[in-house]
């Protein structure tokens, strides 16, 4: 189909009657795809089985699959949240969960392994997001758990018993923290930088008794200014 086209016809049966929609065409480029195209975590469907999973990359030009990290090399622990900087594999971060876990930051051909948790963090470095400059990477620190419902209408509830947000300076190896992002009575989570890097977005919820009050938890979408030159946050959320 290289350089050709595909015509798609769509029909639907609604209230016992068939309807035909307008055909549309997919044009196939004559130019080959670049060598690499997509990375992903591959895990069996289910809620609790993670003994065999890995982070993989697929060559979209021929559909070949290659392993980046396989958890057989990490004593079967869970691998998650692999995040390149704007799809650039030269800057790459991922997290290994568990008692022997760590967070790996790759840049300039070197890898830095960070302790997964300590007293200053209060939880594991879980959900990352790169600053567009590549100088910083924002993380949430989460104490994540899951519970199963006994009713038929719901199956599983994944929840945090604590979570904060901070920024890591990958050049100086320093943490940028602020009490506005680590409240004792609030849970901050999933930080994201704006495209210009001047704002960091995140979600925040009031602390509740989990899992008993899981229905009461409501997250707000918040933002705070960020100065990449000084590595400081604004004074207002």
Residues of each region from the PLM?
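Beta-strand-enriched, solvent-exposed domains that form extended recognition/catalytic surfaces
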Residues: 1-29
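Residue-level detector of Asp-centered blade-edge/turn motifs that repeat once per structural unit
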Residues: 86-88, 132-133, 195-196
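Conserved beta-strand position repeated across blades of beta-propeller domains
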Residues: 83-85, 129, 192
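Conserved, compact domain cores that house catalytic/ligand-binding motifs in diverse enzymes
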Residues: 36-115
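Multi-bladed beta-propeller domains
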Residues: 61-77, 106-124, 167-187, 225-237
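Beta-rich catalytic cores
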Residues: 78-80, 124-126, 161, 187-189, ...
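Hydrophobic beta-strand positions that form the internal "hydrophobic ladder"
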Residues: 91-92, 134-137, 200
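Short, conserved, GDST-rich strand-edge loop motifs in beta-rich repeat architectures
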Residues: 36-50, 139-161, 203-218
């Amino acid at each position: 189909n290289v350089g050709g086209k595909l015509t798609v016809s769509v029909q639907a049966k609604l209230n016992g009657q068939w309807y035909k929609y307008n055909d549309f065409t997919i044009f196939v480029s004559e130019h080959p795809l670049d060598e690499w195209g997509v990375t992903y975590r591959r895990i069996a469907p289910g809620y609790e089985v993670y003994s065999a999973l890995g982070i993989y990359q697929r060559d979209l030009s021929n559909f070949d699959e290659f392993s980046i990290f396989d958890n057989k090399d990490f004593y079967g622990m869970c691998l998650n949240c692999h995040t390149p900087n704007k799809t650039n594999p030269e800057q790459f971060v991922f997290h290994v969960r568990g008692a022997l876990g760590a967070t790996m930051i790759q840049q300039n051909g070197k890898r830095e392994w960070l302790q997964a948790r300590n007293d200053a963090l209060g939880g594991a470095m879980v959900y990352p997001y790169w600053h567009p400059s590549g100088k910083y990477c924002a993380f949430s620190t989460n104490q994540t758990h899951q519970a199963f419902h006994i009713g038929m209408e719901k199956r599983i509830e994944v929840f945090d018993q604590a979570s904060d947000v901070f920024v890591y300076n990958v050049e100086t190896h320093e943490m940028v923290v602020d009490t506005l992002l680590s409240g004792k009575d609030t849970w901050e989570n999933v930080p994201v930088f704006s495209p210009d890097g001047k704002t960091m977005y995140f979600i925040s919820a009031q602390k509740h008794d989990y899992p008993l009050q899981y229905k009461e938890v409501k997250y707000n979408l918040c933002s705070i200014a960020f100065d990449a030159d000084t590595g400081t946050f604004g004074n207002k959320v």
